[in-house]
């Protein structure tokens, strides 16, 4: 074991955090459609299943908000 797997996991976590952070910023500023896309992107790079589910759920909620259904 040379630590590659660990650093690879850290990279995945960093990418998810980065994508999620952008999604939150868009969500807070009221840009729902863009936030939904950002959450979908975050779900795609999430290293854990529960994180993927959370990101998909947020994407769906943002999509509903942009269509006027809260």
Kindly give the residue locations of the regions a language model identified.
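Inward-facing hydrophobic residues that define packing positions of alpha-helical scaffold repeats
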Residues: 39-40, 46
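TPR-adjacent "capping" and linker segments in tetratricopeptide-repeat scaffold/adaptor proteins
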Residues: 2-18
